[in-house]
Amino acid sequence: MSIGASNPASLLISLHDVSPLTLSECEQAVALLAELGIGASALTVLAIPHHEGGAPIDAHPPTIEFLRRLEADGARLVMHGLTHRMTGRAWSPLGFFRAHLFARGQGEFHASDAEEANRRLDEGIAILRRAGLERATHSFVPPAWLLSRAAREVVAERGFDFYELFNGIIHHGNRYARRVIGWGSLNPVEAIATAMYADLQTLSSNVDVRVAIHPADMRLPRQKRAIRRAVARLRSRMRPESYTTYLASQRRYLGAAAE
């Protein structure tokens, strides 16, 4: 957080959708970020326990090793849904836009009731624990940053260290780092539009910003170039931090302000 004029804003980079199905692309993303001076200790890494219902992390040693190595180097591991796949449909205009246009059916918790949300959280936690990734179970980011009202109540009651929505990181009832930059890689038009938006965001005021990188971004040379450009520009004036380090600094600041 840019607490004072002498303090740079925070650059919060998250690597989404790590699973056996995306391991190669995730390794590429980590390597790309390292070239830009973003080491593992400044990363927040989102792991899908049972991607698409057919790729459990605990049954794939290479993915486990990748995540453990990142954690050993200081990355913060986070549970990212269970399967990453939404069940059912959303019929309201806003719900349809969020679930089927923005998230493209990936908003796993967007239509969940409390029972389903609890079940998915319990199953995801069990898989990560079997994989020896206990720390990842202490925080949560829903796929596409979407939670139904019932799912949000469940997540809030679980007592996670933090959870994240599209409009910020929720920690002890407070919301932090509201700005987010990400890229879309579904088609050339989306890729160009999101790259242009990201470039514009890097020029705006010096506030804490989240940068979300997805495996699909590594499949398009255009998006890799856009990520390099945006991260290099932000890195030049901001402080890279994992969510853990960032939130600890917010607690210290709030505590000092209250004295």
Residue ranges and their predicted role:
Residues S6, G37, S41-A47, F162-Y163, ...:
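C-terminal domain-boundary segment and adjacent tail
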Residues L11-L15, L43-V45, L77-H80, H138-F140, ...:
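Hydrophobic faces of well-ordered beta-strands that scaffold small-molecule active sites
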Residues E108-S185, Q223-K224:
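Catalytic domains of cell-wall/extracellular-matrix polysaccharide-remodeling enzymes
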Residues L12-V18, L23, G184-Y246:
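Catalytic grooves of carbohydrate-active enzymes
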Residues L77-L94:
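Short, solvent-exposed beta-strand-terminating loops
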Residues S92-S112:
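Active-site gating loops and adjacent loop-to-helix segments of metal-dependent hydrolytic enzymes
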